[in-house]
Amino acid sequence: FKVKVSIELHPSVSRDIERTLHYGRRYFKVCPEFFIVKVPLTPEGYLAVRKLTQENIPINFTLGFSARQNYLAARLSNPDFVNVFLGRLNQVVIDHEAGSGDQVGEKVTLSTQSALIEAREKYKDVQSKLIGASIRNGAQVAFLAGLDVLTIPPKAIKEFQESGKATNEVISRLNEEIVPGINNSHPLAKRFPCLWEMPGQFISFVDDLMNENGLDEMQGNELVDFCRKHGMNLFHDFTDTELKQIYDHGKIPCLDNWSESIALDDLMTQSALQSFTKDQNA
């Protein structure tokens, strides 16, 4: 069809910078006119994407679940695209009976879009655009109007087309205060705000990281250590046993099984990565 398509690297290379670079370059050479290389969000992924982007290889940095993950990606790695898998964020609330789940993923997505717009305006080298991924219905298509990119399955676009919404009803909600469908009295409620919040402390952390010498030579473990020293819980050190537990459970984690010290965005990303690994191993 002569259209651009994202070609995802195998998850087995996701924690290896050199292999990510090797296969990223190799995939791109197959069809440079239309291939966008899809790289999963890991410490090594951030650093490999930084290099691939500098080589003008188009990148879709996937498996993002929060504004802060994607803001860091835009500043540090500057991929062409970042993602929020919003449907899964709504579902994790529903699965835990922590609320209706309405507009949870939408709030995260719009917060991410705002953060990226701010980054693009302040830092002229930042060009990353947001993909609203995991769209489930036509209402979400309308609610997220004005987003950089939406990936919409046929069922959802048909619902939108048949909704009868007038053109003047389809407006940008970037500056609106979105109230997510989370029961604030639920024991798990406090685990969700990290998905959409962008505190000044986090922006200062990213500023400090960008001022580090040798970013292009940084290794994944060094990025993890830098985050920990700055009090950022972006990358939990999952044991092999924990990874197997995530692998067996599926895309939506059972939050009751995991310490509150593990950030929800990190847990969702790892669950998505292990789920993709399982699919590839089938």
Language-model segments: which ranges?
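Structural signal for hydrophobic packing residues in well-ordered secondary-structure cores
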Residues: 1, 28-31, 109, 113-120, ...
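Active-site beta->alpha loop and helix N-cap motifs at the rims of alpha/beta catalytic domains
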Residues: 1-44, 49, 54
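A residue-level signal for conserved active-site and pocket-lining positions in enzyme catalytic cores
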Residues: 7, 141, 276
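Residues that cap or flank secondary-structure elements
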Residues: 15, 40, 61-62, 129, ...
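Non-membrane alpha-helical structural segments and their capping/turn regions in soluble enzymes
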Residues: 17-21, 46, 67, 102-110, ...
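Short phosphate-binding/catalytic loops that engage adenosine nucleotides
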Residues: 57
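Catalytic alpha/beta core domains of metabolic enzymes, predominantly
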Residues: 60, 65-211
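C-terminal extensions of enzymes
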Residues: 192-282
